[in-house]
Amino acid sequence: MKKIIGISANEVVDAGEVLHHLPISYLPAGYVRAVQEVGGTPLVLPISQPKEAKTYIDLVDKLILTGGQNVSPSLYSSNQSSEALSLLERDLFEIALIEEAIKQKKPIFGVCRGMQLLNVYLGGTLHQDLSLRQPERIKHMQSPIERWVATHDIFFEKDSILTQIYGSRTTVNSFHFQSVDQLGTDLKVTAKSDDHIIESIESSTDKHRILGVQWHPDFSYNVNDKEKGVFDFIVNSF
């Protein structure tokens, strides 16, 4: 029987002229296609009230938290930079999804922002703006380089479950302004970049099954077998 994979959606208030400036709920197709190609059934979870989280988690076997806006600094820091690139409504709903998934002992895979939000939920903090770190050795927001192009190396710890897919090192894409700073409770760091940015985290306890990556396998699953392999692992083994 196919696994049902809940995938968190995003929202925009004005979709532009092509879509008549409508407000839309949306999800980058890479997540959907990757889950389908490895044998899962994707179920899109639109931003909703936190009280609806249980209804959604009851429907799924596993949860994917997707990329998108920055996590609201108000959730982890008293020293806030601009909230302009965040969406608190989304943060609060996805935090409720995390809480319910953990309660139901369902695995969670966080991508980019999704990994950061998992860390914040478990009491960790984030670097709010990597461009302020001096010197900036690696460009962690690689745009305008195409999204599927891998631009920097990362290095895995020997005990990472991802070594079975990537080996001890791999090269990944990079599209983020924020990154994990102080690690949340019951998590361990399992990969870093050359400039010591945390690139993957995993559960350090059997209280929950959590895996997070800072890069976007959804951008390159169709051109890189390893990135497709991580979706295969999430859907069929995690």
What are these regions, as identified by a protein language model?
Residues 113-115, 122:
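Active-site loop->helix "elbow" adjoining a glycine-rich segment at hydrolase catalytic centers
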Residues 211-214:
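Active-site-proximal beta-strand elements of phosphoester/diester hydrolases
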